[in-house]
Amino acid sequence: MSKLYKAAMTPEVFAWAPASNNRALIAGKASYILNSVSAYRSGQKKVPEIAKDVYFVPPLRGPRGTRWTSEHVIYNYIIPKYSRNVDTAKKFLLALVENYDQAMYYSELYNSPAFFDTRVPKGNRGYPSVRGAKNMLDLHNAWFDKDPFALPGEATDKLKPLKDAMKWSTNVGHPGPANPAIGEVFGTFVVPNMMANAARGLKPETAVMQAETLTKVIFEKWRKKGLVGGTT
């Protein structure tokens, strides 16, 4: 990590917020980021010439030859038992699934469906019809093969590598399951801070030990709540 920082990064990365890599990319300061299509879409609108030079690839392979990346955003919909509108909420979720073609299109392919077998509703859907598209998977593949939001003169197949994202995407916490403890480790930046400390000169062994200590405290807290299994 220290070598990567010294060879390819600048001090500002230590103060990055969630959108900082987006801004660095469209400012022409970053050559590689790990992000969804949102950074690219921002570039198309704000700095078209930069966006035209942005491309997508699967995750880089690690030293063991595997390559994984975490899902960027996963929407979760929960209907509380105490809700006064349970039936209405269920109808809304069903309607959302049935009409996710529009969610895909109007999010400019930022959103992808969870249920690929869902049939595409008939009639005017508010976007140019896609010949032969019978279900959400057909639409998804057609749009990622030929991006309907590509700029004039821009390659339309840039998103094609993302069609196989399910093969190399996994949950935060892989190879274990996602759980509240993993969520807190992720949300409080335990691992990024470990990397940052090592990049700034802290002995790698010390950085790892500090991160391990914090992680154990977090897991123990959630074990006491009965929401994480295992032992210390």
Regions found by a protein language model. Give the residues of each.
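Extracytoplasmic ligand-binding clamshell segments of periplasmic binding protein
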Residues: 1-46, 57-59, 87, 207
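A general structural signal marking secondary-structure boundaries and capping sites
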Residues: 5-8, 100, 198, 202, ...
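Conserved N-terminal structural module of periplasmic/extracytoplasmic solute-binding proteins
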Residues: 14, 179, 190-193, 201-232
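Extracellular structured ligand-interaction cores
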Residues: 27-30, 53, 74-76
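C-terminal lobe and pocket-closing loops
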Residues: 38-50, 63-72, 78-187, 227-232
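Flexible, solvent-exposed loop/hinge segments that line or gate ligand/substrate-binding clefts
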Residues: 53-63
